[in-house]
Amino acid sequence: MRYNENIIQVKPSNIGFSLDLTAMMTAADQARAAQPFWTSFFAYLFNQLPPSAEVPLRYKLDEARVRSYLENEIAARYDQGATAYEPVQGSVNFLAGDPGQTLDVDRSVTLVSNALRSPIARSVNLALVRGTLSRPSMNELRIMLQQIIDVNEFTGEVEIYMQDLNTGTDLQLAYRGGETLTPGIAFSAHSTIKIAVMVTAYRFIDEPASEEVIQLVQEMIAKSDNVSTDALMREVLDRTLGPLEVTRTMKALGLTSTYLDGMFYVGAPLLSGGVTTPANSRDDVDTEPDPYNQTVPTEIGMLLTDIYQCAQYGGGSLLAVFPGEITQSECRSMITYLTQNRIGVLIEAGLPDGTQIGHKHGWAIDPLDGLMHAVGDAGLVYTPGGNYVLAIFIHNSDQIVWGDANQLYADLSRVVYNYYNLGTQ
């Protein structure tokens, strides 16, 4: 037997093969006895050999012993299990492991049995199965994300939400200056809240939507136009209280820390005078979230998941909570608008060219000091290795430098992409 370069010699008797000599001798004696006595006697006197008779080779083969030998002596000794990809500390890459190989016992039993029956082909190349490289664990990915934040020397608050759209497995990470925080931090939503505005608007848009409404949605998402956002809410929701309808829609979906409390135009009033949420009620962390619009990465990520499930499968929370108000075709339109938001930075910057992403980003300059303090981006990412939701929000009370923030986003996005596409990194 050959297992790759390893040669194993084995006695047939040790693996359950033996000749059935008794049966063959009996068959030969029966062939002799079948000849007429006097004919055989005179042939013997004149030294004449009797005619030959074919006696079939008979054997006994215990395939259970063959299997046992292969499993306990060969596979146990020579099989090599696969080793997973390993994270490269502080980088966005993974080091390839070894796929390993194992004995295909069922196929090898057949091959060995055939060789035992053959008088000529007495050697066997055992059948092997090449393993597959396994993906690192979610915990290893979480550690890599923390290391990337450290390498980028970002000392403010970072919260990341990622969900596998195939399995539903998710990852939540809240981090600040080497310290792990409890996820669910309130961040200024900025323009990411326009995802919620879009979902709410479609509750009240009758199909087919008018060209005017379609244009407003496109400009709100693809161009992040605040004027169009206010116009959409006035046109479809309510001329004054449209933002409150957005908040009610989010609460109906169970997203209790995501809200919009005013229009986007400068000087717009707070409609509720301030909204208290589970996230902004925390006293262990404060990102100074905008009182007009807030969210947490988990909730904006879950909202994107709802849109995806609605568009992809015609199911999910949107259709369950708002039956008859939102349709699968409308969800597909939402994703189309999100994919038109092409900016080449933040999460998008970490993706290879040609990768499809539907996302909404948001940031603002503080009018008091003229600095940027918070950035958010949340999107649906479609890749060969799997589709996922990724939401990343960051805050720094001192200042966020755009170039540094974009590099951090690109690195965090890239490591998640590589995690799903290990063979192409």
Question: Where do the protein language model's features map onto the residues?
Answer:
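Surface-exposed, secretory/extracytoplasmic low-complexity segments enriched in Ser/Thr/Asn/Gly/Pro
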Residues: M1-E179
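Flexible glycine/proline-enriched surface loops and loop-helix/loop-strand junctions
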Residues: P50-S52, G178-G184, V213-I214, D225-M233, ...
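Surface-exposed patches in mature extracellular/periplasmic domains of secreted proteins
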Residues: Q80-Y85, A121-A127, E157-M162, E207-V217, ...
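Active-site-proximal beta-strand/loop segments in catalytic clefts of secreted hydrolases
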Residues: Q163-L165, Y175-G177, A201, I221-S224, ...
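Active-site SXXK
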Residues: I185-P208, M220, L390
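Short, well-structured active-site flanking segments
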Residues: R203-E219, S224, G242
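Mid-domain, small-residue-enriched loop/turn segments at the edges of structured enzyme/sensor domains
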Residues: M233-F322
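Structured C-terminal helix/loop/strand segments within mature extracytoplasmic catalytic/sensor domains
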Residues: Y292-T295, M302-Q425
